[in-house]
Amino acid sequence: MAPRTSTTIGVDTPFLLAHTLIEHPNHASARAWLAYFLANNTSLALCPIILDEFIHVVTDAKRFENPLSMDQAISVVRDWLHSKENVLQLPTEESIKLQYDWLLGYRLGRKRIHDTEIAAIYCQHGVTRILTSNARDYSVIEGIETFDLSAQPKAI
C-alpha cells in the first residue's frame, strides 16, 4: 500500500462528467474544484472503474443532448491519465478483499458494488477522501470522507 498523502483526493465519475460537459449542472463547480486543487498542489487519484464509467455515461445520447463519441471520450480519459497532477490507483489483491469485506460487513447490495470497489481501491492506496456528487454512495463506509462536488471548494 502506498503511503497516505494529505494532498491526494480521489475523484468519482461525476467529477469527470461535470468537468467535461458544459451542459452538466455541476460544470462550473467542477472547474472551481480543479482550480482549487491545482492552486493547493493537490493530486487527483483516479482508478480504472471511474474512467470506464465516465466513458459509458458520457457517450450515452439518452443522458446528454451532446454526448461525446467513443473517440472523444477515450481522448478525454487519456488526457486525464497523462496529466502530471493525477495518480492512477490500480486494484490490488488487498483492495479486492477489502471491497468484498465491506460489501458483506456493511450488507451492501448489487447496486453498491462499483462504489465499494472505488472506495476500496482508493483506501488501499491511502486515499480516504473522495470528491463526488453522490456522497450517500460512500456514507456507510467508515473512514471515507466525501466532498460535495456541487459545493464551493473548501480546505481538504
Show where each model-derived region lies.
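Active-site-proximal, substrate-binding regions of enzyme catalytic domains
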Residues: 58-88, 96-102
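Short, well-structured N-terminal submotif of metal-dependent ribonuclease cores
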Residues: 1-10, 14-46, 61-75
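Short loop/helix-cap segments at secondary-structure boundaries that form the rim of catalytic
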Residues: 136-144
